[in-house]
Each structure stands twice: as C-alpha cells, then as structure tokens.
C-alpha cells in the first residue's frame, strides 16, 4: 500500500482490538502466572499442511540420489551475492549443520536439529549463528525443487553430510525423518541473561559458585552454541577453555574422545571470518528491516563478502587445504608453536610462529596469496589439556582411527535428538545398532491379551500398584528427543529400578508378579506393565458404573542391561512428578512449573494434563500413598470427585506449611482433605480452572472417563513409533 496522504503520518487506524506487535501481553502484566502456552505449540493453526499430510509418506517419493547430487553441485556453484570461500560452500554448510545439531542438550532433550528450529528466533539471530541465514538461503532452490518430500530439518543436516563427502570424507550414514516446526519453540530455556554474550559475572549469569553451569544449559554464553572461541569470557586460556569444553560437550552427550573428534573434524575444513569491522554489520535477521527479506548482519558500508566477510571476528583457516578432508589439522597444531594475536576485527586468536610458506592456506579469492592459519582457544585446548592431548596425538598418529571416530561422533551429533533407530528413514541408515540410540528389540504380538489381563486382575495387586507402575514406566518419555517411555521396560533395569521416584521396594514387588505372568503367557514385561495399568483403570471405571476397554497395542520389547547406557539414562530420572504428587526435594522452581515442564516433554495438552491429574488422584496413585489431592471418599473409583470437590465453594483452602494446604469445611472448619500447590493450581489458575469446571459438571462424568482413558493411552503409546 502506498501513502496517498501527502506523506503526513496519521494515528493508528485500528482501535487496538488485536495485539499484532509486542505490546504488553497477559504474561507481561502477570509474569508469575503459569505459562500454559508451552503446551499448545505446533498445532494445526500454525502448520500450513492439513491433517492428512504425512511426511513419512512424502519421503518415499524423494529421489535421494538426485538430491545428494544437487547438494554436491551446489557446493561449488558460487553465487555473486555470497561468494563461496575458495569456490566451495562446504565449510559454511558444515557450520550450519553443526550449529543446528549442537544446540541439543541431554538434560531435557531440547534443542538440536530435529525440528528445523534454526529458521526461527532466537536461533536464527544468535551471534554464534551469524551468516548461517546465507547458508539456508543458498539451499532454498533445492528446498523449492523437492518441496514437501524434504523438510528443512532434514535438508540442513544432509547439506552438512554432503559438504563433507564433496571434500573427500566418508560419513557414517544418514537418517531422514526430521519434521519441521512452523514457529519458535516456547518451551526451551536458553538462559536468563538479558544481553547476548553476557560474561559469566553479569546479572542473571548462568554460572554460580566456582564455575557451575546452570542446568539444563550446555552453552557457556547466551547466543553461543558451545564455548567462546576466544577463551572463557573472551580471555584466552586454553586450560580453562578445556574445562568449559568438557562440561559443554558432556551436556551434549559427548565424551572426551568425541569432543576432540568433533572439534578437530569440524575445523579440518572451512575458516573463520573477521577481516573487517563488526561495527559495519547491520541487525540480525529478526531485527532487520523488511527490505532485507529475512537476511541479517548485512554490510552496506564496505564490501563485506568474500575475503572481507565478518562473522565470528576471528580470521583465518585452520588447515593448509580447507576444502579437502585430510589430517592437516593435527599436523599444523603439533608442528608449530602458537602465539596470541588479534584478528583484523579485534578478536583473540592463535597464530603459528615461524610457519613455513607452503603450510599457509591460500587466500579465499586469490590463490597467489597466502595467510597464516589460526587456532581458537578451543583448538589450543586440544594441545594443552593433558587428556585432550593424548587423544589428539592418537588421532594424529592414526588418521584412519580419527576418521572413523569423527564419522561416528558426527552421526551421533546430527541424530542424537531423533529418537531410536526406528525413527530413521531412507536408504543410508547404518545397520549397526549404537548404544546411544537406546536399542529395544521388537516384542511379540501373538499372545492372548485377555488371558494376560485376567491373570493381572487376579494377581492381588491393588489398583494403585497397577496404575502407578505403568505410569512410572511411561512417564520418562520426552518428545524433545524421543527418549524414555514404556517400550523396553527399562524400569526393571539400572538405573531406573533404583530411582527414588519409582519407589524401588514397591516396584520390585509389583514387577515380580508381572514378570511371572509375562513369562507364563509369552508377552514382554513391557506389555505386561502397560496392561497392568489398563486393567487398573478398567477396574476403577467399573467401580464407577462404566464398562470401559482401554485401548492396547501389543508389540513392546524388553531391553537388556547391555542395551542400556546407565549414565545416559540417569538424566531421565524425574526430580518431580506432579501427576503422582511427588517432589524429590524442595526447589526454587514452583511445583506447578515442574508439572508443566513434565507435561510438555510428554507431549500433553493442558486439558490432557488436567484430566490425568484428576484421574490419577482418585485412583490413589500418589507417591508413597500420600493423601494430598485425593479429594474423594471412594479411592480406586474412576470418578470426577477431584474436580467436583476442588470447585465446591463449601470448602476453604488454607496454607499449612511449605507446599502444603488444608481444605476445610466452611461451616465446621474441620479439615476435609490436604493438598499441594499442584492440586490447587487447577482451581486457582483461570485457564486450568475452566477445564476443571468442565470435568466437574454433572453431565460430564462419562466425558471425564473417556478423556482420561484417551490421555492415558496417549502416554502409554508415546514411544510406539511403529504405530505412528
């Protein structure tokens, strides 16, 4: 639209009936309110595809060989608007894929490359992701060509693989299957700092104590993927940087050997860019004006491309031949002594002393010119930290071993958040099962389900035992990286069998019964555990006067201890479970916020979370048999009593200690029930109360049971990727 009013500026033409910009939201006015938005993401209202779209089916139409060739051709098809270094985009594409996958953290499974989230804020505008918008824009013609048959998430990682292969490296494999999201994720906590690259001593720092990094964060600074390339807080000291690397990579699920392999393999090709003044760069993509069309960090003051590009501020390549895979990284690292210098952009970097001319990489535009290679503080850590040095020396002496280790580490980095191997699609999925994939064998489906259910019902186990055991087995599932869940029955293995939240003594007693039944009838223990929960619910519904059959799909397998990486599974241990009204200890975070986080990881909506809480309470499935929140006089009956009594104004609610409340009769002042914050939030939060009122209605008792069974089944089947 053009302004036809002589250039004068008028007042806003709308009466602010809709909030279209960033004026104060409800959460801004009441910042301590429970943010239920994290449960309502990525639904049909933001997804341009209809409910019938199936990415798995679209992938079957993809010509993978043609796609891979197109990507290899792209690598050397330099564009005038963003020229390729040495005529090859490989380094840029690898950095894009690395930074997409490298945002993953093992503590909550969030981040990573499985959703294509690098296209959206904040990741698309992180300082560490500067100029990766150019990489994605270079890929756009390929995305446009293959359309619905290829997600951005898959394309970003495959581009990294093909970049390596086009430079002579053989990758370990590739699995398709990453599905795109369509807006920024609202559930991922990136840190509480108020500025990019805030040092560790700044306000709201992610560090406490000596240098204790806040959970679940992995990166050392807001806006970085892993560590600061100049050193801790920008101060070069390779030994201190080594400690940051060890923490950061461990939180990305990598050990020391994988850390060295990824650092060296990532820096074998490509370069850093800092040949100019960063002050000449424009805003990041989210802050740029509309005419930039989603591109950021544009330099309209100087040339700003090719050899004059500014990205990280460091300037130079790590190796003599930055467009080919070789062992040149370790060759230069150990051949020369290195000294600190400043890049043209003013960043700290390490440069070799008295380097031979033939060891210098050539200029990205003029092959007759040579410049010093560089190392970051992280690179120098591989030489100066004793443990990293041992690994680096072995890699230098055995290039084939290094190549294999890097191939495996790169595959792990780029597939860690995709879930089990059954989620990998396409012709290049490696046949080898890897321990970090949480392998689980297929289970049987040809046994008599009704006979198993009958034996469980006759076993003497209580409804609470049946329901709690099934819930504990399934609740570990997290949609963020598709780990955990009931399949595999790892609740009977270390470390889960000993987790406090699983009530080990009760669990052992119940499992002994279920394992015996499973052995007698030829089903997996995993199936028997889920069936036990279903039986408990059916019995409780029958007690309420409703004949219900809880849906069940056989086929879960039983993992072995050898298939289970104990250390890797320890991060799945719940520290709280509001569904069973349990806290391992008191936390700064409110119990209801911990509940919300758990519900989001499990893939639940707010109504599903609500109905599950109400049902689990009346089934008596609280941790340790606690009576908190059990607002019923008929425990074990699947009734809507929790909601009826929570919303009944015949009662008052009074604090009775830390996270403890009493529900008293208004007339007699007698204590009727006790509760926690998790219970009362369903009456205090206006949104949750609206759901509670629905289930409290006289005409919705049957709806309550129906919705509870549906939500329960969703939880039990969350990790059944074979059914999806």
Swiss-Prot record:
Record text on cofactor binding: Binds 1 heme b (iron(II)-protoporphyrin IX) group per dimer.
Required co-factor? heme b
Crosslink position(s): Tryptophyl-tyrosyl-methioninium (Tyr-Met) (with W-98): 226-252
Site positions (Transition state stabilizer) are: 95
Name any GO cellular component annotation. Answer: cytosol
For heme b, which residues are the binding ones?
A: 267
Which protein, by its recorded name, is this?
Catalase-peroxidase 2
Question: What organism, scientifically named, is this protein from?
Answer: Vibrio parahaemolyticus serotype O3:K6 (strain RIMD 2210633)
């Amino acid at each position: 639209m053009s302004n036809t009013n002589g250039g004068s500026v008028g007042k806003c033409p709308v009466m602010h009936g809709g909030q279209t910009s960033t004026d104060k939201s409800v959460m801004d006015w009441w910042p301590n309110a429970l943010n239920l938005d994290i449960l309502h993401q990525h639904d049909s209202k933001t997804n341009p595809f209809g409910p019938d779209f199936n990415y798995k089916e679209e992938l079957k139409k993809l010509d993978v060989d043609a796609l891979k060739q197109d990507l290899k051709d792209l690598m050397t098809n330099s564009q005038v608007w963003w020229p390729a270094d040495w005529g090859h985009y490989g380094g840029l594409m690898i950095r894009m894929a690395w930074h997409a996958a490298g945002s993953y953290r093992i503590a909550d499974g969030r981040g990573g490359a499985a959703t294509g989230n690098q296209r959206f804020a904040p990741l698309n505008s992180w300082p560490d992701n500067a100029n990766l918008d150019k990489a994605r824009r270079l890929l756009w013609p390929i995305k446009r060509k293959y359309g619905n048959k290829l997600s951005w998430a898959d394309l970003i990682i495959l581009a990294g693989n093909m970049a390596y292969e086009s430079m002579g490296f053989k990758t370990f494999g590739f699995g398709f299957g990453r599905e795109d999201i369509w807006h920024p994720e609202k559930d991922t906590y990136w840190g509480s700092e108020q500025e990019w690259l805030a040092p560790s001593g700044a306000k709201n720092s992610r560090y406490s104590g000596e240098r204790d990094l806040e959970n679940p964060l992995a990166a050392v600074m807001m806006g970085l993927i892993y560590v600061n390339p100049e050193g801790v807080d920008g101060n070069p000291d390779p030994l201190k940087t080594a400690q940051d690397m060890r923490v950061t990579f461990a939180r990305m699920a990598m050990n020391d050997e994988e850390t060295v392999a990824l650092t060296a393999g990532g820096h074998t090709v490509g370069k850093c860019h800092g040949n100019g003044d960063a002050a000449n760069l424009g805003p990041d993509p989210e802050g740029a004006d509309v005419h930039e069309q989603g591109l950021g960090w544009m330099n309209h003051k100087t040339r700003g491309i090719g050899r004059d590009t500014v990205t990280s501020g460091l300037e130079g390549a790590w190796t003599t031949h930055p467009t080919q895979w070789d062992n040149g990284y370790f060759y230069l690292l150990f051949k020369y002594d290195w000294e600190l210098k400043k890049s043209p952009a003013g960043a700290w970097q390490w440069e070799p002393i008295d380097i031979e001319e033939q060891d210098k990489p050539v200029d990205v535009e003029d092959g007759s010119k040579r410049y010093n290679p560089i190392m970051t503080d992280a690179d120098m850590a591989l030489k100066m930290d004793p443990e990293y040095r041992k690994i680096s020396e072995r890699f230098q002496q055995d290039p084939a071993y290094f190549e294999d280790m890097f191939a495996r580490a790169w595959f792990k980095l780029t597939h860690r958040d995709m879930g089990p191997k059954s989620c990998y699609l396409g012709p290049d999925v490696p046949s080898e099962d890897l321990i970090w994939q949480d392998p689980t064998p297929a289970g049987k489906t040809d046994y008599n389900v009704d006979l198993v259910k009958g034996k469980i019902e006759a076993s003497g186990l209580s409804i609470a035992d049946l329901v709690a055991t099934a819930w504990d087995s399934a609740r570990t599932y997290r949609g963020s990286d598709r780990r955990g869940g009931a399949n595999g029955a790892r609740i009977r293995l270390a470390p889960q069998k000993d987790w406090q939240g699983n009530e080990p003594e009760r669990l052992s007693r119940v499992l002994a019964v279920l394992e015996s039944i499973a052995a007698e009838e030829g089903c997996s223990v995993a199936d028997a555990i889920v069936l036990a929960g279903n039986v408990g619910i059916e019995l409780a519904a029958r007690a309420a006067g409703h004949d219900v059959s809880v849906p069940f799909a056989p086929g879960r397998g039983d993992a072995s201890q050898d298939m289970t990486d104990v250390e890797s599974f320890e991060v799945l241990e719940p520290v709280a479970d509001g569904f069973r009204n349990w806290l391992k200890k008191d936390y700064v975070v409110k119990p209801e916020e911990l509940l919300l986080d758990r519900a989001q990881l499990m893939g639940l909506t707010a109504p599903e979370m609500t109905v599950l809480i109400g049902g689990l309470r009346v089934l008596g499935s609280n941790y340790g048999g606690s009576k908190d929140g059990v607002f019923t006089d008929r425990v074990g009956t699947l009734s809507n009593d929790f909601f009826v009594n929570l919303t009944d104004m015949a009662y008052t609610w009074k604090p009775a200690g830390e996270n403890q409340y009493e529900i008293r009769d208004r007339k007699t002042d007698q204590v009727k029930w006790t509760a926690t914050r998790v219970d009362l939030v369903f009456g205090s939060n206006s949104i949750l109360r609206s759901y509670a009122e629905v289930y409290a209605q006289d005409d919705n008792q049957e709806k309550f049971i129906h919705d509870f069974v549906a939500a329960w089944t969703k939880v039990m089947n969350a990790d059944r990727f074979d059914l999806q």
